[in-house]
Design a protein with these regions (language model features):
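A charge-rich, low-complexity, intrinsically flexible signal that marks solvent-exposed coils, linkers
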Residues: 1-87
Length: 87
């Protein structure tokens, strides 16, 4: 299956997990999804009081320079591990 199809399928699989992944795992999923979909982070870093938005933005910027294909493949691999762990 081509990478784009694997990436789309992984997005559907992660929605069906029986338990929610940890916050760290969710941030990793988010950052890989954004990097795979859009490339390097864009826009301004959220303000100090937007803890959730800031954490998400920082996770995404941590992937700066990673190719979209590498991010998509890493996302697919992570979802596969999470499905094995959380069902």
């Amino acid at each position: 299956m081509p990478l784009l199809e694997d990436f789309a399928a992984a997005q559907e699989r992660v929605k069906k997990l029986s338990r929610s992944p940890s916050n760290e795992e969710l941030l990793e999923l988010y950052s890989l999804f954004k990097q795979g979909s859009l490339g390097d982070a864009q826009g301004k870093r959220p303000g100090m009081l937007d803890f959730k938005g800031r954490a998400k933005f920082d996770a995404w910027t941590s992937k700066k320079g990673m190719s979209r294909d590498a991010a998509m493949q890493t996302y697919v691999d992570l979802v596969t591990r999470l499905v094995a762990r959380y069902g």
